[in-house]
Amino acid sequence: MQSEQVRNIILVGFMASGKSSVARAISRRCHWPRIDGDEEIVARARKPIADIFRDSGEDVFRALERTVVSDICGEAGRIIAAGGGSFMDDENRQTMLDGGTVFYLSARPETIHYRVTRGNPNAPVRPLLGAGNPLQRIEELLQERMPVYSQAHHTVETDGLSPDQVAMAILKICGPGIPQYI
């Protein structure tokens, strides 16, 4: 029987912090459905996020993101991998904090840079990181976002850990609040 202690498990963090991979690992263990915020936005808009920004602008994207966050946090028993920037929005953040147990997946800038480039210094740079030094931009963005990320209910370090190890750490924090089929 599902405990009322944990309504949803919501994973937030910077790009490449492991949200989607960890959500899959948790879902396998507790048999709760995994919902990826970015995937849900793409499905509803029927186009990639970059195209939403290009065709309709950031305001339209953020409005759709708020609707998606509200909808996916509205039901219980879900593992939610939030979009990389969705927790930065005040309304989204409050919806997530009210809708489940929020875990900030923390990673060092060097780890994020490696994951984004897959260790290839010539890999294409994600738009958020812009031109210039991607590692420096990651450091700047993490520093800007830390006051917001610190509002999550829990912080879990992901450096040097596999998605399964991070999932187990999260499930340990949740305790008997969710079923586990390991």
Task: Give residue ranges: language-model regions.
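Short glycine-rich anion-binding loops that position phosphate/pyrophosphate groups of nucleotides
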Residues: G84-S86, R108-E110, L161-S162
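Hydrophobic anchor at the beta1->P-loop junction of P-loop NTPases
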Residues: L11
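ATP-dependent small-molecule kinase phosphotransfer cores
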Residues: D36-L97, R118, N122
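P-loop (Walker A) phosphate-binding loop of NTP-binding proteins
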Residues: F14
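NTP-dependent small-molecule kinase module
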Residues: Q2-Q5, A25, R29, E75, ...
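Walker A (P-loop) ATP-phosphate-binding motif of ABC ATPase nucleotide-binding domains
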Residues: N8
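Walker A/P-loop
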Residues: S20
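A glycine- and Lys/Arg-enriched "phosphate-lid" helix/loop adjacent to the NTP-binding pocket
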Residues: D98-M146
